[in-house]
């Protein structure tokens, strides 16, 4: 599975339009999220992943990087190109 540090991702995020998939639950997402992120909770991902463009690279984030790693594994098995964000939103809050 491909991974990127949050710092490296954040530099890209500030300069480019990226597809960011946030797999935290809705209440977590509503409390704090990165602008432009799409919320597809891991608990519902098996039913909602079809909303994602298969021809696009997707960065996947959660709180710490654990749920996003599971989401990346699932999405990769479905044929999506995904990169896990190490450290997740916890790393963002520490910026």
Summary of predicted features, one role per range:
Residues 1-19, 26-57, 66-95:
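Rhodanese-like catalytic fold shared by cysteine-dependent sulfurtransferases
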Residues 61:
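Short, surface-exposed ligand- or partner-binding patches at beta-edge/loop junctions that are enriched
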């Amino acid at each position: 599975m491909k991974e990127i540090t949050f710092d490296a991702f954040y530099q890209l995020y500030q300069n480019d339009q990226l597809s960011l998939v946030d797999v935290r639950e809705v209440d977590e997402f509503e409390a704090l999220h990165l602008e432009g992120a799409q919320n597809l909770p891991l608990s519902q991902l098996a039913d909602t992943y079809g909303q994602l463009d298969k021809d696009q690279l997707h960065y996947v984030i959660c709180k710490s990087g654990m749920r996003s790693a599971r989401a990346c594994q699932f999405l990769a098995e479905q044929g999506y190109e995904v990169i896990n964000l190490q450290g997740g939103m916890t790393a963002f809050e520490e910026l």
